[in-house]
Amino acid sequence: MASGKFITFEGIDGAGKTTHLQWFCERLQGKLAAAGRQVVVTREPGGTQLGEKLREILLNQPMDLETEALLMFAARREHLALVIEPALARGDWVVSDRFTDATFAYQGGGRGLPRDKLETLERWVQGGFQPDLTVLFDVAPQVASERRGAARMPDKFESESDAFFSRTRSEYLRRAEEAPHRFAIVDATQTIPEIRHQLERVLAAL
């Protein structure tokens, strides 16, 4: 644990990743405390003043598909420049609720935006930069839908159909298959204690 690392939490809406993120970060901070390092917790879209304004627009206003993708990457560039890159340069660890995998899954898999367009934006905004670890909370869309149904008023993504989330999930799993060294897949259908046991194994490997 000598240098800063970048960890992302991913999954379709209703997978439960955000529920477990704070717990994971508290445990990670306990491991890092002796080395004098901090855990920076952030999210996408968001994480900066501009990013949070874009988040409000992206989650609630209908827009052209390509406009949506461009705004996602604009928020990401600001996030990298102001939060992620400075924290890693200090030697701190960053844990983000979503990153670029979400854009490929939602705008690519879910909405059908061609992958080559997203790859072009990815190269422009972040070069070859990728998370050191991506924790993917995997759950069937029907299960996630039941969980979302009991939550607050849904945003425009949470209101999407099971078919949309099936495509989104498939893209997440495709990316995990292409980069098994980077992904840790969590069975998010399990109970909270069982999921935390899975996360303990992830923490132990860091």
Curated annotation (Swiss-Prot):
Q: What is the protein named? A: Thymidylate kinase
EC class name: transferase
PANTHER family to which the protein is assigned, alphabetical: THYMIDYLATE KINASE, UMP-CMP KINASE 2, MITOCHONDRIAL
Alphabetized Pfam families for the sequence:
Thymidylate_kin
Name the gene for this chain: tmk
Supply one GO BP term: dTTP biosynthetic process
Q: Which reaction does it catalyse?
A: dTMP + ATP = dTDP + ADP
Q: Name one GO molecular function term.
A: ATP binding
Q: What is its EC number?
A: 2.7.4.9
Give the species.
Answer: Burkholderia lata (strain ATCC 17760 / DSM 23089 / LMG 22485 / NCIMB 9086 / R18194 / 383)
- InterPro entries referenced in this protein's UniProt entry, alphabetically: P-loop_NTPase, Thymidylate_kin-like_dom, Thymidylate_kinase
Q: Where does ATP bind?
A: G11, I12, D13, G14, A15, G16, K17, T18
Annotated keywords = ATP-binding, Kinase, Nucleotide biosynthesis, Nucleotide-binding, Transferase
Protein task: Phosphorylation of dTMP to form dTDP in both de novo and salvage pathways of dTTP synthesis.
Q: Which GO terms describe its cellular component?
A: cytosol
SUPFAM superfamilies cross-referenced by the UniProt entry:
P-loop containing nucleoside triphosphate hydrolases
Q: Give the similarity note.
A: Belongs to the thymidylate kinase family.
**The keyword Kinase is annotated on this UniProt entry:** yes
Q: Which CDD domains match?
A: TMPK
Where exactly are the transmembrane stretches of this chain?
A: none
